[in-house]
């Protein structure tokens, strides 16, 4: 039987099988079964920086400088295959540093060390958690299994920094984003249709998009509050609103930002920012994701006493603010 410390370590380090696809940093290789085709030389990307804060500052300055290609209805054309270069799913405040990932395998990943915070606001790169939420975050990491171990959906914004690649499809009335992670997809309505009923709570919420010049602004509500934003137990409730901004900086670069606003958990909204880059591998395509096949992680984690995360609703918060950390 593992000690409590061992259980916590297991919760941090045990990854679902599909995460292996993201462990070998080969451009255009979305999964173990994929065989990459010939790859063009990597193009330069506007505002490219290892520091998310510097990238985000530059992206704001250049947001209107590029004349993006247009769709038939005159909107910026984001269609194509895209990827990110962040390990924020591990820890928003200190993601693993991709620059140090020179070899394949989990041992090399563990050696990589922390990178710079993906949080670009507040400027200190820290989560503005309320005191009770700091306690809850530590308890989440120690007691609960990340939703991805069960192949559950990741929620927004984590959907945008999970393993694998993305495909963006545009139509006049909507934008669809397909993810290799768990066969997930989002359909973002841009035609002004009304929102779904407030009592409907979904893993990826209810998204509505609008255009502000060349920037696609997406506001997502109605999430179910059952996801972690990273594998360190960062969370929000079902009352959260997430506002994303997609801005094309050049033909091969999108500046992506997401502001999380949940006044039940945080003292103020916070914003993450990073770069999406276009896949340039010839013949690249989204492949089927092997998620649960052969997955022993959940069995192991349950055997050492960890639990499935129950989520936190707005109705739960008053009691959680006054309870002791182990009373759930």
Task: Go through each PLM region and give its residues.
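Bacterial N-terminal signal peptides that target proteins for export
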Residues: 1-7
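PEST-like low-complexity, intrinsically disordered acidic/proline/serine-rich tracts
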Residues: 6, 12-328
């Amino acid at each position: 039987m593992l000690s409590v410390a061992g259980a916590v370590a297991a919760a941090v380090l045990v990854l679902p099988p599909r995460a292996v696809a993201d462990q070998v940093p080969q451009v255009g290789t979305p999964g173990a079964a994929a065989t990459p085709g010939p790859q063009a030389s990597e193009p330069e990307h506007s505002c490219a920086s290892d520091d998310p804060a510097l990238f985000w500052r530059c992206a704001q300055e250049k947001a209107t400088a590029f004349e993006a290609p247009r769709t038939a209805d005159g909107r910026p054309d984001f269609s194509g295959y895209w990827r990110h270069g962040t390990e924020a799913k591990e820890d928003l405040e200190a993601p693993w540093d991709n620059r140090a990932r020179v070899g394949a395998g989990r041992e090399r990943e563990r050696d990589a060390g922390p990178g710079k915070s993906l949080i670009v606001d507040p400027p200190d790169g820290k989560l503005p958690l309320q005191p009770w939420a700091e306690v809850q975050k530590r308890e989440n990491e120690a007691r609960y299994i990340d939703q991805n171990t069960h192949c559950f959906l990741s929620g927004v914004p984590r959907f945008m920094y999970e393993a694998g690649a993305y495909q963006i499809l545009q139509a006049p009335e909507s934008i669809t984003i397909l993810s290799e992670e768990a066969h997930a997809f989002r359909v973002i309505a841009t035609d002004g249709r009304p929102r779904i009923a407030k009592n409907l709570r979904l893993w990826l919420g209810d998204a509505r998009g609008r255009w502000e010049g060349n920037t696609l602004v997406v506001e997502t509500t109605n999430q179910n509050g059952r996801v972690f934003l990273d594998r360190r137990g960062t969370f929000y409730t079902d009352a959260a609103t997430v506002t994303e901004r997609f801005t094309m900086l050049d033909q091969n670069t999108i500046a992506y930002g997401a502001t999380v606003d949940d006044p039940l958990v945080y003292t103020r909204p916070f914003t993450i920012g990073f770069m999406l880059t276009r896949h340039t591998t010839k013949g690249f395509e989204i492949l089927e994701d092997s998620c649960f096949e052969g997955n022993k992680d959940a069995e192991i984690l349950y055997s050492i006493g960890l639990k499935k995360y129950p989520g936190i609703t707005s109705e739960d918060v008053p009691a959680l603010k006054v309870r002791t950390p182990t009373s759930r």
